[in-house]
Amino acid sequence: MKVSASSLRKGNVVDLDGKLYVVLSAQNIHPGKGTPVTQLDMRRISDGVKVSERYRTTETVERATVDDRDYTFLYEDGEGFHFMNPESYEQVTASAEMIGDAKYYLTDGCTVKLSTHEGVPIAIELPRLATFEVVDTEPTVKGQTASSSYKPAVLSNGLRTMIPPYITVGTKIVVLTEDGSYQERAKD
């Protein structure tokens, strides 16, 4: 469907010359003299190439029809990452390139939001928080609690993060999926 360039926002998917692009940032620029323009920074979905385009605010762009649905992660194999729609039990496979670093946060049965275009997954949105167990960290040294120092730790998903000194091996913690940072001790 055709939309004005000025109405595009981060996360929208556009179709330019038969190729799909995801909008990374959209900025409306109003110069003192001349026509206002919209600056779009986009990434081509097929190969990950970043492009930057300028459109007059009156120009139209073809917005791709994208289906956003909740899917349950099943497993990973040589073909890619397999997800199932919990309503229709339909399964889709996403490539490792499309999943990227999100693979560290995928656990059996976790629910994610997949964006699909004509049945092919093009983007993934993880839950904001995830819980993992600390499998390796340095022992706490007495007297270190006065300062707010953090120590390195390895989680059960293989991710490295910084945790407070009172957390020990075997403790479950909650991390932010955007950057893998420690949020709190799990409440279970």
From Swiss-Prot:
Its main location: cytoplasm. Pfam families: EFP (PF01132), EFP_N (PF08207), Elong-fact-P_C (PF09285). GO terms for molecular function: translation elongation factor activity. CDD domains: S1_EF-P_repeat_1. GO terms for cellular component: cytoplasm. It is found in: Cytoplasm. Pathway: Protein biosynthesis; polypeptide chain elongation. Keywords: Cytoplasm, Elongation factor, Protein biosynthesis. GO terms for biological process: peptide biosynthetic process. The keyword Iron-sulfur does not apply. The keyword Protease does not apply. Belongs to the elongation factor P family. Involved in peptide bond synthesis. Stimulates efficient translation and peptide-bond synthesis on native or reconstituted 70S ribosomes in vitro. Probably functions indirectly by altering the affinity of the ribosome for aminoacyl-tRNA, thus increasing their reactivity as acceptors for peptidyl transferase. This is Elongation factor P. It comes from Phenylobacterium zucineum (strain HLK1). The lineage of its organism: Bacteria, Pseudomonadati, Pseudomonadota, Alphaproteobacteria, Caulobacterales.
